[in-house]
Amino acid sequence: ACQENADRLLAKDNLIRVVPEGVQGIRKLFRDRYRLQRFGRGGYIRLCLRTRAPLIPCAIIGGEEASPLLYRFDALADLLRIPYLPVTPTFPALGALGLVPAPTKWRIKFGEPIQFDNYGPEAADDDLLVGRLSERVRTTIQSMLDNGLQKRRSVWF
């Protein structure tokens, strides 16, 4: 992610989407589905603090069943210089066709905006504060996921 581009977009009142879980979120095994991974180093929080932009938490339910990751060939992925090499119920058995996701129903939930007006731009340099705020966002989204999963009737509809 490029902080300068994010600053420029926010200065023009554009919306941006950040995925603080990063690659760790897409390379987690199926048994770990809907358990959020650590949220990186807090660059998105620093951005919100510097620009005073609100953060709208978003939880997506359904995507983790679309391509269930059963195993990762980490050593081979490292040799190929790719983030991960998946083994799913259909890949590599079906070749490239096995990379096509299953048709699951996705539910996208948006939470209440989290404001950072109580902090000045200098708060972006406070690593402890950034860590606490990042964990607050992570637990908010995890709670949204947990609630959505409890209400879901099926993966398919």
Where do the model's predicted regions map?
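Soluble catalytic domains of membrane acyltransferases
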Residues: 1-109, 113-115, 121-124
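C-terminal terminal-subdomain/extension
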Residues: 101-157
